[in-house]
């Protein structure tokens, strides 16, 4: 019995060591990355259009992002609004840019929704265009509410309760280990709604973003 218990603890120690090394390797990798976008840049652009009709704001934002970052924003024919079910909430997103370490997307809900934010190996920031964003941070007993023009920052490893009012729309920027965020983003789609067409749309959008980044890297922004 003692031998079995010792072996079990050895495996646990080995597992925790591997996880610690992996986490350290990931953060070292992120430290070497050259990023296309900056959090404050996205927030500042979004604030310019806060309070406008969200469709008008989004169209102007896309034009400006393409001007500032040619070759890094998906073309109109590849932009698609896709449902997202995760953490008990439901919204919709339109992916503009995606790589292994960054993404930019439009997000929101026409009806309102609430649930768990998820924990990520990434920092995620949302700048509100319209509506309200309620956030209840872990370890606190009071929630905060954010309005158009304000930015909500969700740090790596953090978890919150989130609630969006009807017709809440925002611009979201994520930086970190982006593939790791897909596990949460797709969890309810796979295990609850079983909406596999939405699963396909989501993976296709991410694949398109990766393809665009690879093409721009290999052949330049005019390819």
Curated annotation (Swiss-Prot):
Location relative to the cell: Nucleus inner membrane; Nucleus outer membrane; Nucleus envelope; Cytoplasmic vesicle
Region Important for ligand-binding: start-end pairs: 99-106
GO cellular component, one term: growth cone
Coiled-coil annotated spans: none
Region C-terminal hydrophobic region: start-end pairs: 177-223
GO biological process terms on file: lipid transport; regulation of neuron apoptotic process
Pfam families from the UniProt entry: ERG2_Sigma1R
Keyword terms: Cell junction, Cell membrane, Cell projection, Cytoplasmic vesicle, Endoplasmic reticulum, Lipid droplet, Lipid transport, Membrane, Nucleus, Postsynaptic cell membrane, Receptor, Synapse, Transmembrane, Transmembrane helix, Transport
InterPro entries listed in its UniProt record: ERG2_sigma1_rcpt-like (IPR006716)
Cytoplasmic compartment residues: 31-223
PANTHER family xrefs: SIGMA 1-TYPE OPIOID RECEPTOR-RELATED, SIGMA NON-OPIOID INTRACELLULAR RECEPTOR 1
Additional comment: Sigma receptors are classified into two subtypes (Sigma-1 and Sigma-2) based on their different pharmacological profile.
Record-given protein name: Sigma non-opioid intracellular receptor 1
Organism: Trichosurus vulpecula
Gene: SIGMAR1
